[in-house]
C-alpha cells in the first residue's frame, strides 16, 4: 500500500482513480487476491491498466436497476456514487440507489462492513424485493471489504455482493457480466438445492436457447422466429429483467454468446452442463453458420437445419441487396457487438478495413474474427483510443463509427462520423430485420462529407492551438512573445551545439 511522507500507510481513498497498480496491490494484500486473479483471467487488460470509457460499475449498476424487485446498494467514494447515480438516472433509471458512506476510520476498523450489513438488513423487505445487489467500488475493494461474508439471504431476500473496481474490470460492458455471472451462480445453487419458481411468463413448450448480451428489443423476437423451424424457441436474455428468468436461462439447453465477452456467465452455463454457441445470426453468412451451430449443439438433423436456412437466407440476401452501403468505414466501440456489426456492414457492400473493440478476445468471437480477417479487415481486441484514432487517420474512411472521442476527432478532421452506442448498436441486427437496418443512417452520414468540409473551412483555426479554450474576448495571441521566445530557444540550441564541438 502507498505511504504518506511520514511513512504511514496511505488510505485507499487518497489514491484516486489513477492509482491503478497501487490499488490492485492493496486489494491483493487486503485479502482480495483470489478476486484479482479471477478478474485477470476473465477480463485480461490491454495496453492500458485502467478503463478509457465510463466507470465500469455503471454497467452492472444499470442492469441491476432495470431488474424488477431488485434493490441496489453501493459502497464507494461519495464522488463516484454521485456520478454513477447521476448518469444512471440520466439514462432512465427510475429507482433510488442505496449508499453506505465511509471514512478512513471505518475502513481501517472494519466498521464499513458492519454498516453495509446493517443497511442490507434494514433494506431486506420481501414485500418489495426478491434480491439486493451490493456493489463494492474501487476503494472498498482495495481495502478488502468482504462482501462474501454477508448473509446469502435475509428474510427471504437474496443478497448478491459483487466487486466492480476500475482496476480489475476494464469496461462497463464487462461489468454487466460480473453481475450476471454472480446472479447465475446464485440461481444455479438454488436450482441444485431443489424446485424453484417458474418465470412469470411461464415455461416454453419447446427447448430454448438463452441469449447472452443486451440487444435491441426486436432482436430476441427475430431470433425466436429463426429458431422456430428447428423446433426451438428463444430463451431469456441475460442480463435478465426478473430473477426467475435466471432459472429459465439455466434451463435452456444452449446458451448463445451473442456478445462474446460474458466470460463469468459462460462459466455458469458450462457448470450447468449447457453448450455455448458463439457469433450471432447477423447477415447471410452469419445466420447460416449460426443456425448450423445451434442445430449441431441440439443434435438436430441436417435436413431440418437446411430447411430453416432456406426459409430465411433468401430474404436476408434480398434485404442486403435492397439496402446497399457504399463507402469505407472504420468501426470501434465498447459494447462488444462491434464484430457482428462489421460483418453486417461488409455484407451490405461497405469496405471495413478496421474494427476495434474495447472488449477482450474470447473463444466465442473466433468465428467473427476469422470471417472479418478473411476479408482483409484488421480486428483489434482491447483496442485503445489511440488505436482507434490511428486507424481512422491512417485509413481515411468515408465514415468513422466509434466512441465519443473518436467521433469528436473525426469531426475536427472533416470526416463524417456516428456514435456507435446510440446510433448503431441501438438498432435491430439479427436476421432479415437487421439486414437492411443500417443502410439509411450510414448512407445519410456518408453523404455529409461536403457539409463537413464546409464546416471545417468555416471554423478553421478556431479553438485550436493558441486559440484553444474559452475566451471572454478575442484570443490574446501575442506573436511578439512567441517570436522572442523562439529566439531564446534557437540561441540555447546554438550554445548546446557549440559545447558538443568542444
From Swiss-Prot:
Coiled coil: none annotated. Disulfide bonds: none annotated. This is Chlorophyllide reductase 52.5 kDa chain. It catalyses: 3-deacetyl-3-vinylbacteriochlorophyllide a + 2 oxidized [2Fe-2S]-[ferredoxin] + ADP + phosphate = chlorophyllide a + 2 reduced [2Fe-2S]-[ferredoxin] + ATP + H2O + H(+); bacteriochlorophyllide a + 2 oxidized [2Fe-2S]-[ferredoxin] + ADP + phosphate = 3-acetyl-3-devinylchlorophyllide a + 2 reduced [2Fe-2S]-[ferredoxin] + ATP + H2O + H(+); 3-deacetyl-3-(1-hydroxyethyl)bacteriochlorophyllide a + 2 oxidized [2Fe-2S]-[ferredoxin] + ADP + phosphate = 3-devinyl-3-(1-hydroxyethyl)chlorophyllide a + 2 reduced [2Fe-2S]-[ferredoxin] + ATP + H2O + H(+). Belongs to the BchN/ChlN family. Its main location: membrane. PANTHER family: LIGHT-INDEPENDENT PROTOCHLOROPHYLLIDE REDUCTASE SUBUNIT N. One of its GO terms (cellular component) is plasma membrane. Gene3D superfamilies: Nitrogenase molybdenum iron protein domain (3.40.50.1980). Pathway: Porphyrin-containing compound metabolism; bacteriochlorophyll biosynthesis (light-independent). Keywords: Bacteriochlorophyll biosynthesis, Cell membrane, Chlorophyll biosynthesis, Membrane, Oxidoreductase, Photosynthesis, Transmembrane, Transmembrane helix. It comes from Cereibacter sphaeroides (strain ATCC 17023 / DSM 158 / JCM 6121 / CCUG 31486 / LMG 2827 / NBRC 12203 / NCIMB 8253 / ATH 2.4.1.). It is an enzyme of class 1 (oxidoreductase). The gene is bchY. InterPro entries: BchY, LIPOR_BchN/ChlN, Nase/OxRdtase_comp1, Protochlorophyllide_Rdtase. The chain crosses the membrane at residues 70-87, 131-147, 221-238. One of its GO terms (molecular function) is oxidoreductase activity, acting on iron-sulfur proteins as donors, NAD or NADP as acceptor. GO terms for biological process: light-independent bacteriochlorophyll biosynthetic process; photosynthesis. Chlorophyllide reductase is composed of three subunits; BchX, BchY and BchZ. Forms a heterodimer of one BchY and one BchZ subunit. Its EC number is 1.3.7.15. It comes from the Bacteria. It holds the Pfam family Oxidored_nitro. It is found in: Cell membrane.
Amino acid at each position: 500500500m502507498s505511504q504518506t511522507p511520514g511513512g504511514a500507510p496511505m488510505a485507499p481513498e487518497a489514491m484516486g482513480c489513477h492509482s491503478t497498480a497501487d490499488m490492485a496491490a492493496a486489494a491483493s494484500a487486503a485479502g482480495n487476491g483470489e478476486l484479482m486473479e479471477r478478474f485477470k483471467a476473465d477480463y485480461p487488460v490491454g495496453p492500458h491498466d485502467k478503463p478509457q470509457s465510463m466507470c465500469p460499475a455503471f454497467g452492472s449498476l444499470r442492469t441491476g436497476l432495470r431488474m424488477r424487485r431488485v434493490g441496489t446498494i453501493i459502497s464507494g467514494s461519495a464522488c463516484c456514487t454521485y456520478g454513477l447515480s447521476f448518469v444512471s438516472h440520466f439514462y432512465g433509471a427510475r429507482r433510488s440507489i442505496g449508499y453506505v458512506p465511509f471514512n478512513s476510520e471505518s475502513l481501517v476498523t472494519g466498521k464499513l462492513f458492519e454498516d453495509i450489513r446493517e443497511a442490507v438488513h434494514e433494506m431486506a423487505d420481501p414485500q418489495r424485493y426478491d434480491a439486493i445487489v451490493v456493489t463494492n467500488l474501487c476503494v472498498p475493494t482495495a481495502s478488502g471489504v468482504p462482501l462474501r461474508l454477508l448473509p446469502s439471504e435475509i428474510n427471504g431476500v437474496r443478497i448478491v455482493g459483487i466487486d466492480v473496481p476500475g482496476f480489475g474490470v476494464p469496461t462497463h460492458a464487462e461489468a454487466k457480466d460480473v453481475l450476471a455471472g454472480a446472479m447465475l451462480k446464485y440461481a444455479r445453487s438454488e436450482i441444485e438445492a431443489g424446485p424453484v419458481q417458474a418465470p412469470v411468463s411461464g415455461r416454453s413448450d419447446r427447448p430454448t436457447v438463452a441469449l447472452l448480451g443486451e440487444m435491441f428489443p426486436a432482436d430476441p423476437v427475430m431470433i425466436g422466429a429463426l429458431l422456430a423451424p428447428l423446433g426451438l424457441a428463444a430463451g431469456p436474455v441475460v442480463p435478465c429483467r426478473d430473477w426467475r428468468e435466471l432459472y429459465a436461462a439455466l434451463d435452456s439447453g444452449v446458451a448463445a454468446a451473442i456478445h462474446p465477452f460474458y466470460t463469468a456467465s459462460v462459466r455458469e452455463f458450462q457448470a450447468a452442463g449447457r453448450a455455448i454457441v458463439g457469433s450471432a445470426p447477423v447477415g447471410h453468412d452469419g445466420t447460416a453458420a449460426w443456425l448450423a451451430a445451434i442445430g449441431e449443439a441440439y443434435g438436430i438433423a441436417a435436413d431440418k437445419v437446411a430447411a430453416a436456412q432456406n426459409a430465411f437466407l433468401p430474404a436476408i440476401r434480398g434485404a442486403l441487396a435492397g439496402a446497399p452501403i457504399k463507402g469505407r468505414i472504420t468501426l470501434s466501440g465498447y459494447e462488444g457487438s462491434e464484430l457482428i456489426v462489421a460483418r453486417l456492414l461488409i455484407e451490405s457492400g461497405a469496405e471495413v478495413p478496421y474494427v476495434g473493440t474495447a472488449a477482450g478476445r474470447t473463444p466465442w468471437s473466433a468465428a467473427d474474427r476469422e470471417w472479418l480477417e478473411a476479408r482483409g479487415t484488421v480486428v483489434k481486441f482491447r483496442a485503445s483510443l489511440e488505436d482507434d484514432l490511428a486507424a481512422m487517420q491512417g485509413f481515411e474512411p468515408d465514415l468513422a463509427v466509434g466512441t465519443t472521442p473518436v467521433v469528436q476527432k473525426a469531426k475536427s478532421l472533416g470526416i463524417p462520423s456516428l456514435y456507435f452506442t446510440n446510433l448503431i448498436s441501438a438498432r435491430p441486427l439479427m436476421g432479415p430485420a437487421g439486414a437492411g437496418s443500417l443502410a439509411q443512417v450510414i448512407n445519410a452520414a456518408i453523404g455529409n462529407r461536403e457539409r463537413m468540409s464546409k464546416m471545417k473551412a468555416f471554423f478553421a483555426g478556431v479553438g485550436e492551438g493558441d486559440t484553444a479554450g474559452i475566451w471572454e474576448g478575442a484570443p490574446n495571441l501575442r506573436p511578439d512573445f512567441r517570436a522572442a521566445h523562439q529566439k531564446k530557444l534557437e540561441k540555447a540550441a546554438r550554445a548546446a551545439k557549440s559545447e558538443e564541438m568542444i
